[in-house]
Structures are given as C-alpha cells and as structure tokens.
Amino acid sequence: MKLLFSRNPNPRLAVATARYLKADVTFEFASPMAPGAAETYRVLNPNLTLPILVGEGWSLWEADAIACRLSRAIGSDFWRSDDDEPDMIRWISWGKERFAYACDMVHFERGTKQRYGLGSIDQKLVEEGFRQFHRAAAVLEPELSGREWLVGTAISYADFRMATFLPFNDAAGLPLDDYPSIRRWYDRLEAIDAWRDPFRGLQAPQLPPVKAEA
C-alpha cells in the first residue's frame, strides 16, 4: 500500500497513524492541486484532497477511514473493535464537530490563510473559534482529569483525531495551559515519536511560513 500525503493537518494525522502502527506502507508526498496534477489524482479521490491510501486496484480517502483500514490490517486495537468501539467513535465524532473544529477555525485564520496568502485574518472568526474552543475544552478537561487517554486505559485513534490541529498551535495560539488535564494529555501524545515527528526521514517539503500581517 502507498500513502499519499502532505504536511497539512489531516494528511499529517494519517502519516502519524501509519507510523505509530508501523504499517506496511510506502509514503509518497503528493500535491493534487499543483498545475497539471488534478487528473492524475482525481481517479484516486474526486475531492482532490489528501490523504489517500492506494492499493492494487483501489484507493481510500479520508484520514479516519485510512486509520481504520491500517489498524485492521495489522490487528491493532488502536482502532477499537470491541465494546470500546462506540466510545471511540463518540470521541472521534464529537472532536471533529467541537474541539478539533474550534482549533481548525482559529488555525485557518491565523495559520492557513497566512501561509497561502488567502486574505487577512478575520478577527470575528478568531474570536468565535476561541469561544468554541473554551466551550469544548470545558467538556474535555474533566473527562481527562482522571485518565491518561480518551478511551479505556490505552491510546486509541480518538486521541490522535482529537489532537489533529494541536501540532500547529504555534500559529493558532490556543491557550492549552488554561486546561491542565488537556495539557498533560497532549504532552503524552508529544512523547510519542510517531506523533511528534511523523515526517522524519520522509521526502516532504516544509509548509510555507506563516506571514505576519502588516
């Protein structure tokens, strides 16, 4: 299998997952939106987004689906398949709609738009993102106060998914330190090599720098 990726948040998540699982995949940097590249990638993913997992005669897109397939391929409980599976899916779903969504809202304004010249920062959207971040963090904080991971006693894909945008917090500036249980949980993730530096040894051009607004 081959994993097509970039350094953006969701492809990063897929690479971190594959490397954490030590999955039997090769990694290939891709740029579906590069001039002349669209038709090559459209047959693999009509959305022209990454990540994409490619096998013989098939392709699979979306980071969550890729995590499920890779986990099942090696028999890992990183993607739960027992009684914990509904709980894991609950946190994946809630995270994408609440916590990670809020992180993305702020990161898009302060990070993505400034990297790619997509316009000035919309401070109202930043403020709304912070409001939603605090609301979601107020739910997540007590959940993590008495345990190390979101599901059961071991790490799961729900932890990776919840933290999708936190590696980019140097640009977003979300106040993790206001929530000590979340901070400790994320520090545990950062102690995992595959999460902290998923691109080590891979050919993967750096993201454009975040440009400060004049």
Where do the PLM segments sit?
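Generic structural signal for helix capping and beta-alpha/helix-loop junctions
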Residues: 35, 186, 206-207
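Terminal-tail/helix-coil boundary detector
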Residues: 195-214
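Active-site-flanking alpha-helical
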Residues: 71, 165-166, 199
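GST-like fold's C-terminal all-alpha helical module
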Residues: 95-191
